[in-house]
């Protein structure tokens, strides 16, 4: 729906400033560390780590802070007073029924809603995780990627009800699938690149 799309866009835009700030802080930290310790610089690796820091910052703000926190914050910055609305701590919900079941069996969801919420809202959001984990942590293997992916997803879902969001079985499934797709994509790309050398 148009309202749902506007909400997703607004939520994304609200976390952009804090993500940029985190990126700037990380760059300053790396420059100081490299100069102080006279380290050699692998620019590709540094860029990947920078993107990973920005991605994690954005991800954490999208899924592990109250959904209206940043809109409240920017409202206060702009107007000098609070909206007075609650942030909704400990008001989260729980869903243990996959939405695909609701769509296929009960007909409660439209295919458009399912694609937007599940594929775009969940799976695509975690594909970068699967891509960047093996690039940032070079010695990580397939088994550890699977373990890390499921642990990150479970941790997020367990914490979400605390910040007024929902524990959702769909999120666990789609986030995990997104991470694995990202990992497989980067693995295939690396192997093809090595083959063509």
Explain the meaning of each model-derived region.
Residues 167, 172-173:
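Loop-to-transmembrane alpha-helix initiation sites
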